[in-house]
Design a protein with these regions (language model features):
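Structural preference for solvent-exposed beta-strand-turn elements
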Residues: 1-193
Length: 193
């Protein structure tokens, strides 16, 4: 089974992430940051991964450490669950609309962290969530998962929709990339990812 359990403890947060790439989209998320919970739930549901996230952090200061550490732990769990990446498709992409928003995401499970993220500048709160953390979420996931990720917001105005469509698009791209396609070995001429 392609599963991982990651626990991350710092002076700022305590994070537990359990991930099953071959799940059914079962989700149990509680970070103490409701909008971030909603986004992680989109990631679990639309990827088809089983995802459990439990975070306690210094949200009395703000949500930055909680969001960052949770994103790092998710990225690590994704990397560990993928293991040697034998038989996966490796590449995935998705185009996701959400009302007036259109987002494109593409992923390469390459072992090399790289992020291209294009979104209109959004500086506001969604509930208690600081939208300036958006890019940092993807940076943190990419760094620990060691993947190349491109996310482009092609159209959109509503901040909630812009964020939600990104998480759905990345989820669908990941779903494709982690799929076992029956081809023997690692999908690289190097023989390793």
């Amino acid at each position: 089974m392609r599963k991982a359990r990651v626990e991350r403890k710092t002076k700022e947060s305590h994070v537990l992430v359990e991930l099953n790439l071959d799940g059914s989209g079962a989700i149990d998320v509680d970070t103490g940051v409701p909008f971030f919970d909603h986004m992680l739930s989109q990631l679990g549901k639309h990827s088809g991964f089983d995802l459990t996230v439990k975070t306690s952090g210094d949200i009395d200061v703000d949500s930055h450490h909680t969001v960052e550490d949770t994103s790092l732990a998710f990225g690590q769990a994704l990397r560990e669950a993928l293991g040697e990446k034998v038989g996966i498709r490796r590449f995935g992409d998705a185009m996701v609309p959400l009302d007036e928003v259109l987002v494109q995401a593409a992923v390469d499970l390459s072992g090399r962290p790289y992020l291209v993220h294009r979104q209109p500048e959004i500086v506001e709160l969604i509930g208690t969530f600081d939208t300036t953390l958006g890019r940092h979420i993807w940076e943190s996931i990419v760094a620990e998962a060691r993947i190349a990720l491109h996310v482009r917001v092609l159209e959109g105005r509503n901040a909630h929709h812009v964020f939600e469509a990104q998480f759905k698009a990345v989820a669908r791209a990941l779903r494709d990339a982690v799929t076992l396609d029956g081809v023997a070995g690692v999908p690289s001429t190097k023989g390793v990812l």
